[in-house]
Amino acid sequence: LDSWKSKAKNYLKYDSTGKDVIRFGLLAAAHDTIPDDMNKGLIKIGRDGCSKYMSVDKWLSSDLKTIEHIAPQTNKNSMWDESLYDTHIESFQSLGNLTLLPQDLNSSAGNSDWRKKLLYYQCVAEKDPSKISDIENRATALGVTLNPTTIELLKESNFSEHLSSISLMSANDFWNRDLVDRRTETMLDIIWDRVSKWLFE
């Protein structure tokens, strides 16, 4: 595990490997996992069947079509933790800073700041339709401006379980390199747990 994980940290990155490999890794990490209530923003292995992501339907789903950088690839106006963009490590390209979104929401989120992106993730991970319909008031409370097109996109988005761990964070929490690195470690452990069973059993 240690040898594999060391290599995966360096090579299982958005700019270092094929996008299909990254998507597979994100789906494997989301499969049967739940938010870690002791570590905000992280996930842990849940019960069998609690979050089914390793399926052809999920692979082909338009809701999981594109890879989203949570802290964007370009740190405009230094809105994000600068250490994520260290040129020697580039944590912003690692699995812990990536998730899956539909193409339209990914494009809309773009280079937005943490508060706005969090609102997107909270909408997609929301199970209560009444909270989705109240998106404008939620945005106003966070000091976030949403145009009518974005509001409609969010209202029409389908529920996605894999964003639950991020959606439980608050606008006052920090999306920084420490969290991203810990997310990457956790996700790689889970991926190894899944894949090693196929390789060695």
Regions inferred by a protein language model and the residue ranges of each:
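Long, cytosolic, alpha-helical-rich C-terminal regions that act as interaction/scaffolding modules
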Residues: 91-94, 98-99, 103-201
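Intrinsically disordered, low-complexity N-proximal targeting/linker segments that flank membranes
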Residues: 1-80, 84-91, 95, 100, ...
